[in-house]
């Protein structure tokens, strides 16, 4: 009550922000008459003037009114588009490092020019981030005349672009590109062999278009640069054949504490958490099948440590069959399994599921199984974009995720008012008992809307549903066009004509996002089809478009038909936002049934029972605000669960991210340094001290010393034969500290002599050796971290907190990494022999060829929230113990040794195939 009263007196936070920025808009408007008097050249010179003022100490905040006024005037002259006052407010929101929620058709692309120009004055570069190459190129070329009229350079980065062109694009004042390409370039730069190989400048300011898509929908998608690993294609095929013989257990829910099973089976499926688990009987059945197929020894257990790889194959195959369905989560295209983005309905070529799941689906679909890969470098969008000192974003739907933006990224959301009042009508949902009734109602309503000359957009959540709707509309004789992942190439043309009178378009989720549906269709598309169109032809096309536009307005504008609710309210709002652009009329409605996934899995039993108790006749629908509220509550549950998963993934990746930043910082220092001799000297002293301490414990008596062992170790590590025992016999005053110093002096003198013999090239060798050791060790460390994270869930069963265990053990692994880099570097430098400049260059070429063979991948993490028992929180921490990822138990078996399973075969031809 008090909160409402305060809000009424002082206004909401959003209203107060808009009021504050409105005062600055008044200042910008006051500058407009003076700027209109300037010539084009004088307007261009304003950029130099503003840059000089920034260099002299003025802040970007102080320059903002004049800079925005300059951009507005350039837009009016060059593009014929003058920024509205609300667009200026959007620009200020972006400048301040926040998210501007702007409705569809409110000109987000034009808004971005304001803060992009302002921040480019600082000379540190501005990155404008889009979701695909087409939008990056389109927006850059569309806004290029405006920027160039003000003396600003514009660059575009695209996938597969040569490094020299990328370097030029990044050197521009304003750079357009995709989130994927920015992230991959960051990773590649941190694998570069020299400073000259890098393409990016230090990160400064980024504006993310469709920020919700990139920072929330893509948050669970790590960017990974990988190299080829061992091929296990045959194992995937064999396990896939076995899994098809397993049956699913059907549960009828719970009766008190007892689970009621209607059909016993080998595995259970939890659709909410997307998990598959073997039942007790299923575990026995799988072991029997594996033994029969000679994949498991008769006396072996599937859960033994040396069979973890086999268990991993079984679990992956189970998930591929039970959780992933063709034409819903993926399609098979040209002999490849291509994933479908659940949020947009677009295909994602080149993107693969991690942890062997993609290979399991390939085996299921009987297509070529691509080899698994080894991670060489990785990051997440969450951690990459948090590297920018200032980050901003634009989208039509951010307010429902405002808490997550603030919690994860520290970004506040400001809802920007529309330039014209919204005329769209959002109708209550219609809820039917069955899918069949729902589809029949949709067909009837679409037929009526289309007959009334209203354009109709039918939004679906999957390719399967879009094709089902297409079949039903065809049967009803309704002409329509389909826009889904299978028809990606025709997307622009379909969207361009989707606003014509009576046109019916079926689209998966938000396919076509980023392009407005214009009422009456886009007349520009018709002009583009004509070669050398005359003014008369253009006028005729415009006149025809005016007629169509008026017909559509009279029919109530674009009609949106949602065939089901998405898990996220934000995706539903995006679909609704396709109608009612720039004050146009429009109507939206969602059609649901109790058999829809969201209703079946997440809606409460109470609502289901309530609807059935009403005794609804076949074909009847419930249309009430109470039903809408119940559905929104179900969506909030799912959103909360997904947020917890994303937050938890971030907490795990934050551990790796801290380590990544340390390694990349050290690597950059190595690249920048001309001479690392002093660093090598310090590292050598540390390594030598560690080696000596193993055989001469600090502050120990001489009887505890292992001099013979020390002499042998020094020969192994440093290639030196030192007669330490003889030194001690000859000099009784040679105690621990003097002895350490003498050993170090001998090692240093030997190394100095080698450097003298090899010459100046030794400086380059030192640098390259340390870089190579760091890269190889980091690669091994990433693999160890992957193994650690995959098994860390199980710690909760031992009453331990998985997060705390992960942090502790990853820290130990990182300490080992740093020690390994030091020891390996000194060991290699001690063994290095003189080489020529030509040999050095040949080694460099070989490393570059290896880099060129690496693949850029985006993997979907299929991780659910990790279990954390309350007991784990309160239990005292266990004594620290060094723990490496479990790979095998017992003695390591040679590849040509007899297999321990007793089959009589060589290990490499039997169970060694699993490694």
Swiss-Prot record:
Its cofactor is Zn(2+). Keywords: ATP-binding, Cell inner membrane, Cell membrane, Cytoplasm, Membrane, Metal-binding, Nucleotide-binding, Protein transport, Translocase, Translocation, Transport, Zinc. Signal peptide: none annotated. SMART domains: SecA_DEAD (SM00957), SecA_PP_bind (SM00958). One of its GO terms (molecular function) is metal ion binding. One of its GO terms (biological process) is protein import. It holds the Pfam family SecA_SW. SUPFAM superfamilies: Helical scaffold and wing domains of SecA (SSF81886), P-loop containing nucleoside triphosphate hydrolases (SSF52540), Pre-protein crosslinking domain of SecA (SSF81767). It is found in: Cell inner membrane; Cytoplasm. May bind 1 zinc ion per subunit. It is a peripheral membrane protein. One of its GO terms (cellular component) is cytosol. Zn(2+) binds at residues 899, 901, 910-911. Its main location: membrane. It catalyses: ATP + H2O + cellular proteinSide 1 = ADP + phosphate + cellular proteinSide 2. Its EC number is 7.4.2.8. ATP binds at residues 87, 105-109, 516. It comes from the Bacteria. The keyword Ion transport does not apply. Belongs to the SecA family. Part of the Sec protein translocase complex. Interacts with the SecYEG preprotein conducting channel. Has a central role in coupling the hydrolysis of ATP to the transfer of proteins into and across the cell membrane, serving both as a receptor for the preprotein-SecB complex and as an ATP-driven molecular motor driving the stepwise translocation of polypeptide chains across the membrane. Monomer and homodimer. Part of the essential Sec protein translocation apparatus which comprises SecA, SecYEG and auxiliary proteins SecDF-YajC and YidC. PANTHER family: CHLOROPLAST PROTEIN-TRANSPORTING ATPASE, SECA INNER MEMBRANE COMPONENT OF SEC PROTEIN SECRETION SYSTEM. This is Protein translocase subunit SecA. It comes from Cellvibrio japonicus (strain Ueda107) (Pseudomonas fluorescens subsp. cellulosa). The lineage of its organism: Bacteria, Pseudomonadati, Pseudomonadota, Gammaproteobacteria, Cellvibrionales.
């Amino acid at each position: 009550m008090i909160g409402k009263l305060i809000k009424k007196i002082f206004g909401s936070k959003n209203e107060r922000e808009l009021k504050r920025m409105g005062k600055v808009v008044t200042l910008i408007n006051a500058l407009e008459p003076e700027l209109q008097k300037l010539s084009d050249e004088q307007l261009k010179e304003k950029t130099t003037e503003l840059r000089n003022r920034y260099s002299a100490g003025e802040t970007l905040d102080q320059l903002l009114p004049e800079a925005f006024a300059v951009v507005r005037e350039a837009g009016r002259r060059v593009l014929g588009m003058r920024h509205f006052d609300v667009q200026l407010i959007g620009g200020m929101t972006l400048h301040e490092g926040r998210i501007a929620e702007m409705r569809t058709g409110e000109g987000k692309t034009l808004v971005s020019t304001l803060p992009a120009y302002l921040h480019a004055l600082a000379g540190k570069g501005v990155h404008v981030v889009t979701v695909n190459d087409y939008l990056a190129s389109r927006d850059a070329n569309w806004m290029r005349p405006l920027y160039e009229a003000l003396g600003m350079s514009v660059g575009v980065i695209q996938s597969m672009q040569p490094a020299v062109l990328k370097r030029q694009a990044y050197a521009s004042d304003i750079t357009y590109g995709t989130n994927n390409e920015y992230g991959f370039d960051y990773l590649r730069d941190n694998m570069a062999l020299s400073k000259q190989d890098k393409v990016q400048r230090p990160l400064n300011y980024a504006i993310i278009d469709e920020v919700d898509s990139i920072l929330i929908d893509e948050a669970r998608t790590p960017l990974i640069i990988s190299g080829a690993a061992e091929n296990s294609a045959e194992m995937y095929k064999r396990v896939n054949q076995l899994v098809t013989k397993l049956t699913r257990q059907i549960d009828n829910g719970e009766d008190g504490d007892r689970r009621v099973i209607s059909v016993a089976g080998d595995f259970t499926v939890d659709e909410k958490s997307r998990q598959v688990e073997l039942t007790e009987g299923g575990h026995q059945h799988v072991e029997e099948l594996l033994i029969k197929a000679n994949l498991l020894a008769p006396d072996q257990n599937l859960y033994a440590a040396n069979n973890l790889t086999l268990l991993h194959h079984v679990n992956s195959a189970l998930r591929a069959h039970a959780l992933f369905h063709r034409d819903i989560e993926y399609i098979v295209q040209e002999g490849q399994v291509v994933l479908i983005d659940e949020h947009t309905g677009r295909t994602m070529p080149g993107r693969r599921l991690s942890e062997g799941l993609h290979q399991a689906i390939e085996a299921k679909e009987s297509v070529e199984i691509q080899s698994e890969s080894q991670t060489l470098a990785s990051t997440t969008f969450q951690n990459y974009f948090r590297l920018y000192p200032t980050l901003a974003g634009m989208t039509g739907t951010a307010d429902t995720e405002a808490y997550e933006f603030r919690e994860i990224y520290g970004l506040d959301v400001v809802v920007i008012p529309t330039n014209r009042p919204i005329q769209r009508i959002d109708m209550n949902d219609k809820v039917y008992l069955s899918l069949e009734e729902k589809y029949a109602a949709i067909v009837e309503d679409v037929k009526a809307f289309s007959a009334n000359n209203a354009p109709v957009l039918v939004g679906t959540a999957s390719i399967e549903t879009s094709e089902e709707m297409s079949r039903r509309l065809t049967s009803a004789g309704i002409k329509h066009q389909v826009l889904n992942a299978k028809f990606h190439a025709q997307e622009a043309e379909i969207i361009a004509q989707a606003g014509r009178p009576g046109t019916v378009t079926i689209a998966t989720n938000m396919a076509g996002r980023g392009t407005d549906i214009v009422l009456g269709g886009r007349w520009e598309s018709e002009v583009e089809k004509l070669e050398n169109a005359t003014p008369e032809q253009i006028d005729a096309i415009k006149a025809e478009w005016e007629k169509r536009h008026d017909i559509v307005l009279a029919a109530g504008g674009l009609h949106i038909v949602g065939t089901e609710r998405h898990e996220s309210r934000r995706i539903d709002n995006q679909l609704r936002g396709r109608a009612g652009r720039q004050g146009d009329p429009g109507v939206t409605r969602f059609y649901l049934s109790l058999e829809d996934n969201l209703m079946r899995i997440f809606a409460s039993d109470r609502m289901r029972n309530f609807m059935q108790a009403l005794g609804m006749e076949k074909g009847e629908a419930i249309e009430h605000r109470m039903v809408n509220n119940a559905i929104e509550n179900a969506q909030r549950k799912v959103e909360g669960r997904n947020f917890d998963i994303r937050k938890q993934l971030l907490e795990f990746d934050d551990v790796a991210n801290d380590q990544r930043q340390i390694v990349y910082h050290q690597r950059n220092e190595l690249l920048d340094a001309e001479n690392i001799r002093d660093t090598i000297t310090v590292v050598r002293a540390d390594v030598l001290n560690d080696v000596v301490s193993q055989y001469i414990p600090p502050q120990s008596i001489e009887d505890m010393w292992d001099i013979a062992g020390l002499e042998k170790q020094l020969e192994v590590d440093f290639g030196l034969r030192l007669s330490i025992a003889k030194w001690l016999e000859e000099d009784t005053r040679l105690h621990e500290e003097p002895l350490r110093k003498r050993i170090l002096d001998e090692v240093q003198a030997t190394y100095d002599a080698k450097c003298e013999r090899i010459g100046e090239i030794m400086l380059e060798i030192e640098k390259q050796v340390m870089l190579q050791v760091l890269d190889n060790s980091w690669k091994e460390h990433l693999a160890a971290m992957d193994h650690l994270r995959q098994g860390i869930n199980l710690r909760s069963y031992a009453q331990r907190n998985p997060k705390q265990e992960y942090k502790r053990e990853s820290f130990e692994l990182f300490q080992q990494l740093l020690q390994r880099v030091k020891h390996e570097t000194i060991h290699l430098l001690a063994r290095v022999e003189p080489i020529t400049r030509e040999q050095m260059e040949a080694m460099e070429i070989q490393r570059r060829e290896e880099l060129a063979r690496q693949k850029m991948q985006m993997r979907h993490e299929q991780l659910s929230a990790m279990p954390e028992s309350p007991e784990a929180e309160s239990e005292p921490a266990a004594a620290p113990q060094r723990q490496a990822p479990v790979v095998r138990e017992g003695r390591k078996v040679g590849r040509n040794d007899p297999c321990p399973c007793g089959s009589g075969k060589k290990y490499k031809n039997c169970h060694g195939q699993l490694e």
